[in-house]
Amino acid sequence: MDHRLLEIVACPVCKGKLTYDKDRQELICKLDRLAYPIKEGIPVLLEPEARSMSMDEGR
């Protein structure tokens, strides 16, 4: 994941900052507790495609 891209992308729900989870290949919004998948190197920033994170994840 290009770190320059992380500087400009935002959560489509709250417009907050996203962090990159290399192991899961996801972009994480800690505010909304949503994880957006990265498929074939392309972030899929669609709310229906995001998975809800448990309360224990992302701590």
From Swiss-Prot:
Pfam families: Trm112p (PF03966)
InterPro entries registered for this protein in UniProt: Trm112-like
GO CC annotation terms, alphabetical: cytosol
PANTHER family (UniProt xref): PROTEIN PREY, MITOCHONDRIAL, ZGC:162634
Family note: Belongs to the UPF0434 family.
Protein name as catalogued: UPF0434 protein VC_1876
Protein source organism: Vibrio cholerae serotype O1 (strain ATCC 39315 / El Tor Inaba N16961)
